[in-house]
Regions:
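ATP-dependent carboxylate-amine ligase catalytic core
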Residues: 2-16, 20, 26-112, 120-147, ...
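Internal gly/pro-rich beta-alpha loop/helix module
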Residues: 127-228
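Short hydrophobic alpha-helical runs that function as membrane-insertion/retention elements
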Residues: 116-119, 174-176
């Protein structure tokens, strides 16, 4: 079976930047000529509209509360079959489900056997990220954290301090998004306007920032897996 890069984007909490990073990476991959198959954990119908506008393909909900594990795996394999890369956007905090972690993003990653890229809001923190990340890396050994992308980083020096966190924990630091007023405004308005212009607004800027500050080639090179 052919292997393709595939991963789930999760975060410690809601509001960390999952949707911003998901849309930006999808836009960047499309810009590079890749066929991107988007997915969304849970029943959310708003983020899927934004995914489809970016990728030109339907974004598929993966909901382990409403559907059986077999059905979720089947959906994932079917829609990813002709893609160059599969990107799953998580929901809420990584382990937040309806009963402990049941129905959570972590459950979807475990079910599909795909690695996680953790998006962490680093505003107003530096080495205090170490115990937080250590918990997510070690809490479930059957879920692999493929790398970390820091959001709302204040300066290159701030980012260097965050890189030291990843070095000490032996986890890949994939890069960061700098703190930008435009990105925070975009996040606040997502879901309030369903016009086509809003669905794609700011994507070029976002993709450009990720291309500049995230090692997307390293990411794609380390997460090639056969489809489940």
């Amino acid at each position: 079976m052919d292997s393709i890069p595939q991963f789930l984007i999760a975060a410690p909490t809601s509001g960390s930047g999952k949707t911003t990073v998901s849309r930006g990476l999808m836009a960047l991959f499309v810009k590079k000529g890749l066929k991107v198959q988007p997915f969304k954990c849970g029943p959310d119908y708003i983020d899927t509209k934004y995914h489809e506008a970016v990728c030109g393909r339907p974004s598929i909900n993966l909901d382990t509360f409403m559907a059986s594990p077999e059905h979720v795996r089947s959906l994932y394999a079917r829609y990813s079959a002709d893609a160059d890369v599969a990107v799953v956007e998580g929901m809420m905090g990584m382990y937040d489900g309806y009963d402990r972690d049941r129905g959570s993003s972590a459950e979807v990653a475990r079910l599909l056997g795909i690695p996680v890229v953790l998006v962490v809001d680093a505003k107003s923190a530096a080495y205090s990220m170490a115990p937080l990340l250590s918990g997510f890396i070690n809490f479930r050994p059957d879920i692999r954290i493929a790398g970390v992308i820091f959001n709302r980083v204040g300066s290159p020096h701030h980012y260097r301090m965050l890189q030291e966190v990843c070095e000490d924990l032996n986890v890949t630091c994939l890069g960061y998004l700098p703190k930008q007023k435009e990105l925070e405004q975009e996040s606040r308005h997502l879901g309030l306007d369903f016009s086509r212009s809003k669905e794609t607004e700011g994507l070029d800027m976002l993709a450009g920032l990720l291309e500049e500050h995230v090692d997307w080639e390293l990411l794609l090179s380390t997460i090639g897996l056969p489809l489940p």
